[in-house]
Amino acid sequence: MLYIEKEGLPNDINSKIIELSKSEKWKSISEDDTTAIRNAFDNDFPKNEAKEILLHEQHGICAYCMRRIRMDNHSRVEHLVPLSKNKDMAIDYNNMLGVCDGGEKVTGNQGHILCCDAHKKETEIMISPLNKVQMNKIAYDSEGKIYTKPKDEDMERDINEVLLLNGIQKKDGTVRDTSTELLKGRKDAYDRARKMMVALNIKGKCTSATVSYTHLRAHETLMN
């Protein structure tokens, strides 16, 4: 996960959202009518325009797992505070993130270990890619596992139990990766970066600039 800095919406899109919020149709929807709120968000909210801006400000990566996402049916608009929990925040752009499909469309024999929004569903979480202090705690080990440093139990609970960013740990201690192979992708990126660092060190070219470049290449590999 990486810190996401909101850029805001253009005036024309903001105007559409304000118009929706002031409409009689929106005002008539009760706070607990999740179906009606969802229908209004899907049909009356400028969702595609908002999604395009989300992907731009997130540099085309999922807000949770950092996989590459594009303007297609493998990406979606996620509500950080679930749509079912707060009517007003259902159309608040500052409550929205661009995320992947979490492996819902993956085919094959791996099985469906969903992640990100696909597994989170309507669960409320305290971890947020919009929180810079939290994102500065995110770290990765050599096996591709995400953890927090210093340790934050609430964040790790959301990472491991709600978003499933580290797959599922089985009773025998082994880990089953997600359908999107998040752990494998991170481990492969780590291994490539380590090999590049070793090679550069042997050549005497292991400078701070090359370290930064190597980290960037590893991150690009992870996103694809």
Question: For each of these PLM feature ranges, what is it?
Answer:
Residues 6, 11-61, 86-91:
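Short, charged surface segments at domain edges that flank catalytic/cofactor-binding sites
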